[in-house]
Amino acid sequence: MAEKTGLFISFEGGEGAGKSTQIRTLAEALRGRGFEVVVTREPGGSPGAEAVRHVILSGAAESFGVRMEAILFAAARNDHVEEVIRPALARGEIVLCDRFLDSSRVYQGTTGNLEPDFIETLQRIAIDGVVPELTLIFDIAAEKGLARARKRADEGATPDRFEKEEIETHEKRREAYLDIALAEPRRCRIVNADQPEDKVTEDVMSFVEPLLERAGNAADAAHE
């Protein structure tokens, strides 16, 4: 029997970049082609991690400081990996995750001013070898992304505390994501998020398509 191995794709980017919309679109397309797909998110994705998500995004953890917040993120990520992501990959499924390790590097590292070595040590413990085969970084000017996020809030969505931060902070995060893509070109692809939604979808699929043959083989193995 062939070894079962799924496909892990993470979606990264600043506020209002359109990640969640593209995850839903991609998941629907892949399921239509017969793939088993798990859609998940961070912080959260598992019962334990969702409890931590509420603490972090509500702002309740801010009083503990950015270092403790990074530890909370890592704890949530480890639970998510062990309870959801690793089992799904072992079943030969495709995992689409809205944010993963790069968000910690950017949000707690770059704009949280935590030492890179501290962040990387936490990540090694949290992910325990589970790294996305592909990371799609959705790039859009911070001002445009925040305008989208505000429109979403006007339509009833609850803004999280990150959306309320200064524009300069969001621009630093954009630059940090682009730096990650430059440093890890084999894993990361930049998606121009400042274009019509259907064109963004085309670009996403152009990056995902080369990986689907392997995922298809994994799905076949999972049913042997």
Curated annotation (Swiss-Prot):
Gene Ontology MF, one: dTMP kinase activity
Function description: Phosphorylation of dTMP to form dTDP in both de novo and salvage pathways of dTTP synthesis.
Keywords carried by this UniProt record: ATP-binding, Kinase, Nucleotide biosynthesis, Nucleotide-binding, Transferase
Catalytic reaction equation(s): dTMP + ATP = dTDP + ADP
Listed name of the protein: Thymidylate kinase
Biological processes, Gene Ontology terms: dTDP biosynthetic process; dTTP biosynthetic process; dUDP biosynthetic process
InterPro entries for the chain: P-loop_NTPase (IPR027417), Thymidylate_kin-like_dom (IPR039430), Thymidylate_kin_CS (IPR018095), Thymidylate_kinase (IPR018094)
EC number: 2.7.4.9
GO cellular component: cytosol
Cytoplasm is among the record's keywords: no
Protein biosynthesis found in the keyword field: no
HAMAP family: Thymidylate_kinase
Pfam families per UniProt: Thymidylate_kin
Superkingdom of this protein's organism: Bacteria
Record-listed ATP binding positions: G13, G14, E15, G16, A17, G18, K19, S20
Enzyme class per UniProt: transferase
PROSITE patterns according to UniProt: THYMIDYLATE_KINASE (PS01331)
Family according to the record: Belongs to the thymidylate kinase family.
